[in-house]
Amino acid sequence: RRQRQMCIRDRLEAAHLILPRLRDITGESVQLYRIENGQRVCIATSEPPTGLRDSVPVGAHLPLYVGASSKVLVAWAEMSIQRSILAEGEITETQLRDTRRRGWAQSIGEREPGVASVSVPVRDARGTVLAAIAVSGPIDRIAKRPANMWAADLKTASSVITKHL
């Protein structure tokens, strides 16, 4: 348990270095999520200083069956979690398989109307998925294919966080 708490602390420290840079590159809100008690929890965020943005406060609990970060977290979660979420019917096995194959997931208006997002996994040194990092914002700015705009930048940010773990 102590080692897990240290890993979470290290991940947060790395995220606090990387998330603002990713926010500056994208001009959009950036979040880091993990699974906790069957939900996705925002554990770090960085928001643009002005303008319309998708605000998710640290500590917010969100459902695991909608949104890009949920797809990422569930795609690499334990089978019991995958089965539970698949039974809800919002996320499909095909979506999870596609997420694992591409290394990212996107959503358009799933969690909140008018908001789009793209997310990638954050792994530890052994390759275990610990979290999901996401860029989110208004569909009007991000467009209907946010992965085309930000998946590569997210993957780079994820790699940097992994190197800090």
Each predicted region: which residue ranges?
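Short, acidic, Ser/Thr-enriched surface-loop or helix-capping motifs
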Residues: R1, I35, D124-A125
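Short, small-residue-biased leader/transition segments that mark boundaries at the very start
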Residues: Q3-I8
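Residues at secondary-structure transition points
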Residues: D10-E13, A60, L64, R145, ...
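Solvent-exposed, charged/polar functional surfaces in cytosolic regulatory/catalytic domains
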Residues: R21, I25, D98, V160
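Extended hydrophobic
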Residues: E88-S159
